[in-house]
Amino acid sequence: MLGAMFRAGTPMTPNLNPEGGGHYFIDRDGKAFRHILNFLRLGRLDLPLGYGETALLRAEADFYQIRPLLDALRELEASRGTPAPTAALLHADVDSSPRLVHFSARRGPHHYELSSVQVDTFRANLFCTDPECLGALRARFGVTNEDRAEGGPHFRLEWAPRPAELPEVEYRRLGLQPLWTGAPGEPRDVVGTPSFLEEVLRVALEHGFRLDSVFPDPEDLLNSRSLRFVRH
């Protein structure tokens, strides 16, 4: 019935359902279908800039046999071409160095106790030739004081999770900072190499990369120090 609306000379019988009032009700998902209705109203294909659901829209148009819309989609895709994912390289290196920190803890009005705790500092270097993937990695991680001015294909991070034994004031005095990931309202601390590389792996797979090498132990992915991803 919907396809008939686009074909001149096709008789349209009224809806005989008493609840329809002589009109037709179209119950479809609005994600792509609203563009079909816009095409019906305007007589032209008017899609947002960068619209990436043309395959879904074409499937809907084919289902309803809307030939003018199918023709318009073919013209659009021919003008755009079909961009294939470009070849790219992603390399993630993580290094950790332990540090013994001494601090004094107040145990009473005139009682101070000297304590020590190990603090692990992590340094990560991400190299990616795909700017979109690198941007996603930058957005994935957050630190308190971060310089994002670094350009090119590199992205470097340094963080040190605070041990429970180390007071917050001493942690800040030492100039240490945590690293977190996740939504702004629900941040999760990145406590070490495995959790950091897990997030890198997620982003890499989301952008079409595949794992190419693991160092030093190929059998122990998340406890490695270096991951290399490629996209052909």
From Swiss-Prot:
The keyword Cell cycle applies. Residues 1-49 form the BTB domain. Keywords: Cell cycle, Developmental protein, Growth regulation, Transferase, Tumor suppressor, Ubl conjugation pathway. Pathway: Protein modification; protein ubiquitination. Gene3D superfamilies: Potassium Channel Kv1.1, Chain A (3.30.710.10). It comes from the Eukaryota. Plays a role as a marker and a regulator of neuronal differentiation; Up-regulated by a variety of neurogenic signals, such as retinoic acid, epidermal growth factor/EGF and NGFB/nerve growth factor. Induces apoptosis, growth arrest and the expression of cyclin-dependent kinase inhibitor CDKN1B. Plays a role as a tumor repressor and inhibits cell growth and tumorigenicity of medulloblastoma (MDB). Acts as a probable substrate-specific adapter for a BCR (BTB-CUL3-RBX1) E3 ubiquitin-protein ligase complex towards HDAC1. This is BTB/POZ domain-containing protein KCTD11.
